[in-house]
């Protein structure tokens, strides 16, 4: 099965972008080759840009507090495991505490590092990080993998409280949804929202279908059009019925 997630708000869109970047940087930091660590640093620069939104930290803190209050209300529910509930609440408390302790603008330490910012500036130029452009960076890339990994982890560290908060919020968001089986006849599916609230849609599709969903949604209607991709040709509308699972996620 292949999962597709579609954010219905700018906030969730930002969280999904950051989640993808965190996954990427952690993957490449664990590698050993200089080019892989170069990609890790570029991903840290992207995290710096995406997380620079002024209200990101406060949004996460507010959402974590709201979820904590919601979960606390479930404490006397016999269908809820007390142990599981306590574990989630502990994770929320830990993430909130780390966010509170992260003073100032997210990533300010990196912005004040002139050497890193000189590299970041050159990355905006195609081919701008050649060794003759940035000899000091070329020298760093020739150091041991352990030294590079240590440096990268230090540069990533200021963003980890944000990552922890994002992981909890997205986990709760994904688990909030109710899944239903649907069919897109001739590759097209439409549904009136009728006041249904959702922050994210999830579409789960069997790998046997050689098609991908194109999604458009607003507060009035949801439209999904499945298209097929053949080689380098333009996508074409699917001509067969497509069975899929649809989940509306909302906190």
Model segments located where?
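Hydrophobic/aromatic-rich structural module bridging two neighboring secondary-structure elements via a short loop
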Residues: 52-115
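Alpha-helix boundary/N-cap detector
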Residues: 9, 13-16, 59-62, 83, ...
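Charged, well-structured binding/catalytic surfaces in domain cores that contact anionic ligands
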Residues: 95-200
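Charged, amphipathic alpha-helical oligomerization/scaffolding segments
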Residues: 13, 17-20, 24, 39-42, ...
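Extended, charged low-complexity segments
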Residues: 199-251
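Alpha-helical rod/repeat scaffolding segments in eukaryotic adaptors/tethers
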Residues: 4, 33, 78-85, 109-112, ...
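N-terminal ordered "arm"
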Residues: 2-62
């Amino acid at each position: 099965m292949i999962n597709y997630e579609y954010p219905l708000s700018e906030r969730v869109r930002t969280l999904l972008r950051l989640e993808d970047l965190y996954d990427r940087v952690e993957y490449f930091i664990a590698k050993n080759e200089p080019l892989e660590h170069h990609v890790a640093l570029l991903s840290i620069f992207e995290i710096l840009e995406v997380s620079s939104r002024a209200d990101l930290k406060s949004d996460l803190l507010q959402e974590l507090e709201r979820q904590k209050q919601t979960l606390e209300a479930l404490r006397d529910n016999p269908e809820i495991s007390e142990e599981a509930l306590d574990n989630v609440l502990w994770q929320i408390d830990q993430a909130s505490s780390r966010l509170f302790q992260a003073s100032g603008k997210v990533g300010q330490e990196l912005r004040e590092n002139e050497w890193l910012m000189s590299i970041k500036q050159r990355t905006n130029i195609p081919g701008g990080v050649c060794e003759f452009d940035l000899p000091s960076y070329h020298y760093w890339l020739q150091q041991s993998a352990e030294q590079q990994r240590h440096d990268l982890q230090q540069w990533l560290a200021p963003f980890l409280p944000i990552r922890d908060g994002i992981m909890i919020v997205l986990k709760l968001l994904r688990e909030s949804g109710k899944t239903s089986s649907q069919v897109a006849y001739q590759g097209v599916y439409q549904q009136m929202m009728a006041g249904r609230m959702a922050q994210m849609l999830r579409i789960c599709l069997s790998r046997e279908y050689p098609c991908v969903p194109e999604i458009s949604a607003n507060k009035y209607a949801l439209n999904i059009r499945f298209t097929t991709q053949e080689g380098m040709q333009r996508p074409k509308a699917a001509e067969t019925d497509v069975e899929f699972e649809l989940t509306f996620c909302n906190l």
